[in-house]
């Protein structure tokens, strides 16, 4: 018997032992996510249900205090993926950056009020309206544009108060303003306290040319990173899609997510869940891009270069096209 034949079983055994001791290493993705955002809900569910392991991913998640910190992280190269909005991505691309976005949420807010007489844009004339964010907040600009099409200049015909979302919510609760244009989660809080959703920003979007619920935020990453990590990104999108589905349908998953919200009564938590589920993207990237382009034109017209930068139309590479198979 030759030496090779005598050693064959030993070599085979060694190879099997080595393979068993050296599993395929999970691919690492660095995420920088806002601590209070719904992405934190999803990451909690991902960990609790082992979805990251199923996807062969090693997630390095850094929690941030604000969306602005995420922008700094992706620009500085300290994160592979952050969450931001397509308007910011489009502006960055217009200024030379190579960022792109994959749909995350269509969740938008509403004009919230306790006053049953406020039901339409025209009912805001002569009223005090709180606006979460500032004069260049996207929802506010869209609301202004929609009002102008109806012959109403809200800046002239209503008293506008700008402020951070918590401040505007507090002013609404104290009765210091007649209505509040709030982000979706603060709108959910007010809804739980008896406020009604007088004007849906999703309806405003449709009135301005959108065909459906428009993605507002997305996973943002660099073109170069996407080219080198396409498969890992696809698995990441499938994984987060599973987390979204679990939060929608599985009470254990929802309980895991709800722990991230803080103390809320059961009715408010149910509203949070309902609004979160409603914000899950359901359309193709092409459909999302078409609607975003329509709204971009409106925003560019009313917000000008201060809002959109030098780009007059939506950059066609704003939305990432490499993961259609990962749509959930």
Give residue ranges: language-model regions.
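Bacterial N-terminal signal peptides that target proteins for export
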Residues: 1-11
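Bacterial N-terminal signal peptides
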Residues: 9-19
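Sec/Tat signal peptide C-region and signal peptidase I cleavage site
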Residues: 20-26
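Short, glycine-/small- and polar/acidic-enriched structural segments
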Residues: 27-155, 159-162, 171-174, 178-184, ...
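Short, solvent-exposed loop/beta-turn-alpha elements that line the ligand-binding surface or hinge
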Residues: 50, 54, 202-212, 278-288
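Pocket-lining segment of extracytoplasmic ligand-binding domains
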Residues: 86-88, 166-259
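Secondary-structure end/capping motifs
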Residues: 226-305
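Conserved C-terminal helix/tail region of periplasmic/extracytoplasmic solute-binding proteins
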Residues: 293-328
């Amino acid at each position: 018997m030759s030496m090779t034949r005598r050693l064959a079983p030993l070599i085979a055994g060694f190879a099997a032992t080595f393979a068993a001791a050296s599993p395929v290493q999970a691919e690492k993705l660095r995420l920088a996510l806002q601590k209070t955002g719904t992405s934190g809900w999803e990451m909690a569910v991902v960990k609790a249900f082992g979805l990251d392991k199923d996807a062969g991913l090693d997630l390095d998640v850094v929690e941030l205090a604000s969306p602005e910190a995420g922008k700094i992280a992706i620009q500085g190269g300290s994160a592979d993926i952050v969450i931001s909005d397509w308007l910011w991505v489009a502006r960055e691309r217009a200024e030379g950056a190579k960022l792109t976005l994959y749909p995350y949420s269509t969740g938008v807010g509403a004009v919230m009020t306790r006053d049953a007489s406020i039901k339409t844009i025209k009912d805001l004339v002569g009223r005090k309206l709180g606006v979460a964010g500032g004069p260049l907040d996207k929802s506010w600009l869209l609301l202004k544009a929609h009002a102008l099409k109806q012959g109403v200049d809200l800046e002239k015909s209503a008293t506008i108060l700008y402020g951070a979302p918590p401040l505007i919510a507090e002013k609404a609760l104290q009765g210091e303003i007649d209505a509040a244009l709030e982000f979706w989660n603060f709108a959910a809080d007010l809804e739980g306290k008896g406020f009604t959703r007088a004007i849906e920003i999703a309806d405003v979007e449709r009135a301005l040319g959108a065909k459906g619920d428009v993605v507002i935020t997305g996973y943002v990453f660099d073109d170069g990173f996407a080219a080198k990590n396409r498969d890992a990104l696809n698995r990441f999108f499938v994984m987060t899609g599973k987390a979204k589905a679990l939060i929608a349908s599985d009470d254990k998953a929802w309980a895991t997510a709800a722990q991230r919200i803080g103390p809320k009564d059961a009715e408010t938590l149910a509203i949070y869940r309902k609004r979160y589920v409603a914000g899950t993207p359901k359309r193709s990237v092409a459909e999302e891009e078409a609607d975003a382009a329509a709204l971009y034109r409106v925003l560019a017209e009313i917000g000008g270069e201060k809002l959109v930068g030098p780009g007059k139309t939506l950059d066609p590479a704003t939305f990432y096209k490499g993961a259609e198979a990962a749509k959930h």
